[in-house]
Regions:
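Hydrophobic, small-residue-rich alpha-helical packing segments that form membrane-like cores
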Residues: 193, 198-207
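His/Asp/Glu-enriched short active-site or ligand-binding loop at hydrolase and phosphoryl-transfer sites
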Residues: 208-220, 386
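Active-site-proximal, glycine-rich beta->alpha crossover segments in alpha/beta enzymes
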Residues: 77, 81-140, 146-159
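Active-site and substrate-binding clefts of carbohydrate-active enzymes
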Residues: 2-60, 65-107, 118, 222-539
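Acidic (Asp/Glu)-rich catalytic clusters
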Residues: 2-5, 50-58, 130-147, 166, ...
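Conserved short loop/turn motifs at secondary-structure junctions
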Residues: 184-194, 354-358, 478
Length: 539
């Protein structure tokens, strides 16, 4: 009776935020992006894994936790600020339970109170402030496969120097080993942006696979025999898995995707704007400007104005999430049965999403996942959930194909990250990389203050390489912040470069930069050396 499944499903969640940490301020708006994702996505995902494991429900999920996110999760300052964040939310929720008694919003207020109590319990009692240990636990159980990403989510096809590509991959692999105690088996290339040949740098770090947008596989050479429904090997021997668009659209699509259902919670109406100012003020930032609290009392309702939204019903929404999970399972069964018949082999369907979709943008998304895992375990035998590593172990023989340059951005190539809103960045970025390579080659064995300065130069370069700055400029959201961040890292790198080349280091300024931009404490600037890059390319 063994092996009667007709195919495989690999669910891949990409968890990422840019490195945002501002010790120079008592509180900082953009740090809330991290705190919101912790409360709405990362801890709720762990909560699901805890419940499923406790009840004996097997599950498989692959999840990238990018190096900037790992560094923020492990940072002492951000951990303390996160505690302040969720304790304030819990205090507000407790007040709301009293205020909304005998109203349509009481059940929602109770929901938030229960939620924030659980967040505190998970963070303090389960993981003792070290959330990465929670993810590591499920990886060691074999239920979760954690993969890495470029060091700062750098957009690799626009890197002119291969030293920069090598640095992004090597730093990521080293940081992964530091946090998880072993090397990464897989990687999520930032923005699924693949440039032919860059996979040699993945191979050098022992990385066995990565993911591509559909056309990166379909337009490969020679033509892939099974489309995106089997991985291919690059000439380097690293496997590439292609994204399945059918399952993607059922969740992502703004028109037909599950998250748009009228019973689900409305993202854009928040208590921070609805309540009396004096009442809500203690829960705002020090500047007193109204902002999102994460507590929202209304449902999508339909295509109506925000002030016409109907009260949110948590029970109704949860029932809908269960229904959608059943529909998603049914569709995967039919899809895999069809592909099995058509291809004459067991296909693998790779469903890829931003992790923050689940719980943050789509509040009920975490309920959907929990129901889906349960239904897959108990209600069907057609589809087996696997990680990419498990699939490659079971099916090691795959076609050799050279995938094509591709991304998962709008129109499928580089336009989102290179256009009239952000093209001015690249002349600065290319020059910084060129200078960083020069420094790494010029000082192969620096020590003392010079070594610290060179390491900080490398931090500033990789922080400037983050694809998030170009993306935010294109989207027009947080445009001022992303511009300021890129300019700041450029200024800091250039200042350090001039001091190093002029042999006049200002240690006070260096200390300040080490305090502000403390990502990758383990940084070794020689990761940018031409010799290291060439050694990796030959491996």
């Amino acid at each position: 009776m063994a092996n009667k499944e007709k195919g495989y499903l690999s669910l891949v969640l990409h968890a990422h935020l840019p490195f945002i940490r501002h010790p120079e301020y008592e509180d900082f708006l953009e740090e809330d992006w991290f705190f919101e994702a912790m409360c709405e996505t990362y801890l709720p995902l762990l909560d699901i894994y805890e419940r499923l494991t406790a009840e004996g429900t097997d599950f498989r999920v692959t999840m990238s936790i990018t190096p900037p996110l790992c560094n923020m999760m492990a940072d002492d300052l951000l951990r303390e600020r996160f505690r302040r964040y969720y304790n304030l939310r819990l205090e507000l929720a407790e007040k709301e339970v009293v205020r909304t008694r005998n109203t349509d919003f009481y059940e929602v207020a109770k929901m938030y109170e229960t939620k924030f109590r659980r967040i505190r319990e998970l963070y303090e009692d389960y993981y003792h402030g070290h959330i990465l240990e929670g993810f590591k636990k499920f990886q060691e159980m074999g239920k979760l496969e954690i993969i890495t990403c470029g060091a700062t989510h750098g957009f690799l096809p626009l890197a002119l120097r291969k030293e920069a590509v090598h640095a992004q991959i090597k730093l990521a692999a080293d940081n992964y080993r530091k946090h998880f105690g072993r090397g990464p088996r897989g990687i999520w290339l930032a923005e699924c942006a693949y440039n032919p040949g860059d996979d040699v740098f993945l191979k050098a770090q022992g990385i066995r696979y990565f993911f591509l947008e559909t056309h990166g596989i379909i337009y490969g050479s020679p033509r892939p025999r099974y489309g995106v429904y089997a991985p291919v090997y690059c000439p380097s021997g690293v496997a590439a898995f292609g994204r399945d668009m059918e399952s993607a659209q059922q969740v992502w699509s703004a028109e037909t995707g599950y998250p748009g259902d009228h019973r689900y919670r409305e993202f854009y109406r928040d208590l921070g704007y609805d309540l009396e100012y004096d009442y809500i003020k203690p829960y705002l930032h020090q500047d007193g400007v109204r902002r999102n609290t994460g507590m929202k009392y209304f449902k999508i309702t339909g295509k109506v104005q925000l002030d016409q939204k109907a009260p949110y019903n948590p029970h109704e929404a949860r029932e809908m999430a269960a229904s959608h999970a059943g529909n998603f399972m049914f569709n995967r069964e039919r899809q895999i049965e069809h592909l099995n018949h058509f291809l004459g082999k067991k296909p693998i369907v790779v469903s890829m999403y931003d992790a923050e979709l689940y719980g943050h943008w789509w509040y009920e998304g975490t309920d959907f996942l929990e129901f889906f895992f349960k239904k897959m375990h108990h209600d069907q035998k057609t589809v087996k959930m696997v990680t990419p590593s498990e699939y490659l172990s079971m099916h090691p023989d795959n076609q050799v194909v050279q995938p094509s340059m591709s991304t998962w951005g709008d129109k499928g190539y580089s336009e989102v990250w290179l256009n009239g809103t952000n093209d001015w960045m690249y002349r600065h970025l290319h020059k910084q990389v060129e200078r960083m390579v020069e420094l790494a080659n010029k000082f192969p064995a620096a020590d003392g203050t010079l070594r610290r300065a060179l390491n900080q130069c490398a931090r500033e370069v990789v922080l400037g390489m983050s694809s998030d700055w170009a993306f935010l400029m294109t989207m027009g959201t947080a445009k001022n912040y992303s511009t300021k961040r890129f300019v700041a890292h450029t200024h800091r790198f250039n200042g350090l470069y001039e001091q190093i080349m002029g042999n006049r280091l200002e240690e006070g300024w260096l200390k300040d930069l080490e305090w502000r931009d403390n990502i990758f404490p383990e940084m070794d600037y020689r990761v940018f050396s031409t010799e290291e890059m060439e050694k990796a390319a030959r491996s």
